[in-house]
Amino acid sequence: MEGQTFKKKERLRLKRNFKNVFEKGGRLIDNNFVIIYVPNTMDYNRIAVIVNRKFGNAVVRNLIKRYIREIYRTNKTFFPLGYDFVFIPRKELSKNFKGIDYSQIKNQILKLVRKLEA
């Protein structure tokens, strides 16, 4: 269980950091997610989740953000160290969100992250 925390330093918060990720970052894309990543100079990862207002109501948007943060928190070992990640759920996911459970979302995200390591 040790190491399964989501510390404040692991959050991507500053505008200049977001700008760096969007300008210089690579993209991992599938039907439901876009993950934008860029190497950072730290020995840990930082993440952010961006959910468009068109994704659904506030309850659904917050739920998907909690899911993604929890997937990251419990599966840190699958993420290569020293990266900034921005997770963006796509509109396709919002259409099917009620029919998709946590484990399916987890599998999709981890599958995308494995592409980064390859």
Curated annotation (Swiss-Prot):
Q: Name one GO molecular function term.
A: ribonuclease P activity
Enzyme class, spelled out: hydrolase
A single GO cellular-component term on record: ribonuclease P complex
- Catalytic activities: Endonucleolytic cleavage of RNA, removing 5'-extranucleotides from tRNA precursor
Enzyme Commission no: 3.1.26.5
User: By its UniProt entry, which InterPro entries does this protein fall under?
Assistant: Ribosomal_Su5_D2-typ_SF, Ribsml_uS5_D2-typ_fold_subgr, RNase_P, RNase_P_CS
Instruction: Provide the alphabetized UniProt keywords.
Output: Endonuclease, Hydrolase, Nuclease, RNA-binding, tRNA processing
Set out the biological process GO terms recorded for this chain's protein.
Answer: tRNA 5'-leader removal
**At the top level of its lineage, which domain of life is listed?**
Bacteria
The keyword Hydrolase is assigned to this record: yes
Q: Which Pfam families match?
A: Ribonuclease_P
Q: Which Gene3D superfamilies match?
A: 3.30.230.10
This chain's function reads: RNaseP catalyzes the removal of the 5'-leader sequence from pre-tRNA to produce the mature 5'-terminus. It can also cleave other RNA substrates such as 4.5S RNA. The protein component plays an auxiliary but essential role in vivo by binding to the 5'-leader sequence and broadening the substrate specificity of the ribozyme.
Tell me which NCBIfam families the record gives. rnpA
Provide the family line: Belongs to the RnpA family.
Q: Give the record's subunit note.
A: Consists of a catalytic RNA component (M1 or rnpB) and a protein subunit.
Protein name in UniProt:
Ribonuclease P protein component
